[in-house]
């Protein structure tokens, strides 16, 4: 079925043994409900199909039966992806964005309630508003993608090299730089329950690389 989705979530790319490079994308359907679009090889899309956050897009969707989370769908054919107008801006304190996201969606403030609903498989996407933002954390992690995933990609390149040009192979199998750090928020909910959540948004990766470039490769200066 063809649906319109208002994109609100786009993660930094990761490598998958099954699907190569992936970006987890989520947003609000035109009926106000949440949707997760998975898998979606974002960087392989033609430039005009590369959507931005807070932009309406249209494509053919069907339920992803390999993922039991209720909101998960997959794109039937990436060629059907169509961006609609420009991304919605931040004018009037994000008024238009808020109308689309909050009009039909509950704002959760109790984390235990959300966790219980997730355990019952009633939802896996929601709007959550912390009571307090306590701190921001940075942790070092592996600096390179795992060798087994890279080996699988290389094997696919070798299999396809007889049928595709080098330019086509570069487009399909170029690997995004791996972030050498993980970023977290620590926060509390309305009951005072403290939690830590990893930040996986595309923007956190872009911010790190931009700061690193600005600081001429000095990682500690880039991390602030």
Regions found by a protein language model. Give the residues of each.
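N-terminal ordered "arm"
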Residues: 1-65
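Surface-exposed beta-strand edges and their flanking turn/coil or helix-capping segments
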Residues: 40, 49-53, 72-74, 88, ...
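OB-fold single-stranded nucleic acid-binding module
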Residues: 62-76
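Short edge-strand/loop segments of extracellular domains
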Residues: 77-83
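Nucleic-acid-binding small beta-barrel platforms of the OB/S1 family
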Residues: 85-224
């Amino acid at each position: 079925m063809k649906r319109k989705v208002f994109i609100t979530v786009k993660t930094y790319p990761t490598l998958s043994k099954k699907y190569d490079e992936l970006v987890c994308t989520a947003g609000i359907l035109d009926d106000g409900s949440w949707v997760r679009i998975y898998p979606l090889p974002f960087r392989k899309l033609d430039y005009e199909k590369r959507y931005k956050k807070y932009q309406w897009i249209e494509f053919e969707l069907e339920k992803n039966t390999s993922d039991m989370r209720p909101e998960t769908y997959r794109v039937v054919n990436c060629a059907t992806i169509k961006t609609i107008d420009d991304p919605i801006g931040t004018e009037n304190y994000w008024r238009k964005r808020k109308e689309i996201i909050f009009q039909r969606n509950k704002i959760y403030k109790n984390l235990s309630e959300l966790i219980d609903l997730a355990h019952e498989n009633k939802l896996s996407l929601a709007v959550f508003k912390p009571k307090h933002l306590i701190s921001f954390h940075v942790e070092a992690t592996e600096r390179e993608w795992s060798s087994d995933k890279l080996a699988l990609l290389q094997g696919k390149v070798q299999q396809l090299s007889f049928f595709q040009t080098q330019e086509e192979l570069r487009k399909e199998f170029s690997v995004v730089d791996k972030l050498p750090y993980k970023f977290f928020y620590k926060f509390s909910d309305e009951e005072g329950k403290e939690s830590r959540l990893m930040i996986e948004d595309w923007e956190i990766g872009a911010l790190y690389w931009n700061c690193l470039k600005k600081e001429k490769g000095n990682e500690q200066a880039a991390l602030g």
